[in-house]
A protein has these predicted regions:
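A short beta-loop-alpha structural element at the N-terminal edge
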Residues: 2-16
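Conserved GNAT-fold acetyl-CoA-binding loop/helix
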Residues: 15-44
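A short helix-loop-beta-strand connector motif used in the catalytic cores of GNAT acetyltransferases and
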Residues: 43-54, 71
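Conserved beta-strand in the GNAT
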Residues: 54, 60-76
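A short, internal acetyl-CoA/4′-phosphopantetheine-binding micro-motif in the GNAT/acyltransferase core
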Residues: 71-82, 106-107
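Conserved acetyl-CoA pyrophosphate-binding loop and the N-cap/start of the following alpha-helix
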Residues: 80-81, 85-93
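Conserved GNAT acetyl-CoA-binding A-motif
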Residues: 97-109
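Conserved active-site tyrosine of GNAT-family acetyltransferases
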Residues: 117, 122
Length: 146
């Protein structure tokens, strides 16, 4: 599996990974945007305007990570690719690209993500009731400092 910068032609597959991963990892979280809105967002914003990376396997795109302004804003893997070390590789790359530190948000219902980030040295610094995010889902702010 190769991790590389996303190109415009990766946007549809990266969006599909996001959609499948979100549905599998966060079944109780209500998304405020339709599948088509998510695909458009990846095509018009995420890939062209953010530092977007994809994990490219023989079968196609199996992971996506988005960095922006010192934030690890998105990290999603195809459900059948969890537990294979891709997330570890993405986080190592994120730290390499942001050696001064990183921040991120995770939903409180996503215990596996919280454990994953804590294992990688991220520390929970703020818990919210979700009123500040589109999903209105309680979340937690994590920070990593070298």
């Amino acid at each position: 599996v190769t991790i590389r910068r996303a190109t415009a032609r990766d946007a549809p597959d990266a969006a599909d990974v996001w959609l499948r991963s979100f549905a599998a990892a966060l079944p109780s979280v209500v998304r405020p945007r339709s599948d088509d809105d998510v695909r458009n967002y990846f095509r018009e914003v995420v890939v062209p305007l953010r530092e977007t990376w994809v994990a490219d396997a023989e079968s196609g795109i199996v992971g996506v990570m988005v960095l922006h302004d010192g934030e690890l804003s998105q990290l999603y893997l195809a459900p059948d690719w969890r537990g294979r070390g891709l997330g570890d590789r993405f986080v190592a790359l994120a730290k390499e690209r942001n050696p001064g530190g990183l921040g991120l948000w995770a939903f409180q219902v996503n215990g596996p993500a919280q454990r994953f980030y804590e294992r990688h040295g991220f520390v929970a610094v703020t818990y919210t009731d979700g009123s500040g995010n589109e999903e209105r889902e309680p979340d937690v702010r994590y920070e990593w400092r070298p």
